[in-house]
Amino acid sequence: WNSYSFLVTYANIDNWKPQSEYFKPEDLTNDLDRWIMSYLQSLTKEVNEQMSAYKLYNVLPAMVNFIDNLTNWYIRRSRRRFWKSGNDQDKLHAYETLYEVLSILTKLIAPVMPFVAEEMYQNLELTAFPNAAPSVHLRDYPEVDEKFIDRELEEKMSFVETAVRLGRILRNEKNIKIRQPLSNFTVVANREITQNAV
């Protein structure tokens, strides 16, 4: 819900509206945008597999983990893109990406959070596209688009997240405030992919 509120708040401030129902992830150049789209496709694949196997108990934790990463990693790292004045291509891509993620996520969560999904759908999709289906529950369930899954990028981002989390733990242990700059921070990586991530 926080991600949805963030998008709606800043979209209203900038008077931004989605231009088309057909988003093009292949046009994205920002690594954060490409990562969240890849992660969303991985989530879509996992949710479909788990639901097909009637393992609904595995669906909600995967969704919660995704939402946590969306709000606490993607949006926090992208905030300055939304805050800057003017509407350059990077800012527009940030809006388009977050809108697309929330649009697909709304459909993914509909079976397990029907009322939240419906509220988000009514405000996101129907406001922008009045000819869309009148309810999220009348839309096709999302299917994975494998070509947008980038496992290497997801692994790199996971490593960076882990490094940041461990850095916060060390800051806490040493009583160093988050906003205080560090003179240096050493990350040890034993694999080439993780070395490239840093």
Indicate where each model-derived feature is located.
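Aromatic-lined ligand-binding clefts that engage carbohydrates, nucleic acids, or primary amines
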Residues: 60, 64
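Short helix-adjacent coil turns
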Residues: 51-58
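Extended, charged helical/alpha-beta scaffold domains that provide interaction surfaces
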Residues: 168, 172-198
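Short, hydrophobic/amphipathic alpha-helical patches that form generic packing surfaces
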Residues: 2-9, 104-107, 166-169
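Acidic, turn-prone loop/beta-hairpin segments
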Residues: 14-45, 76-166, 184, 188-191
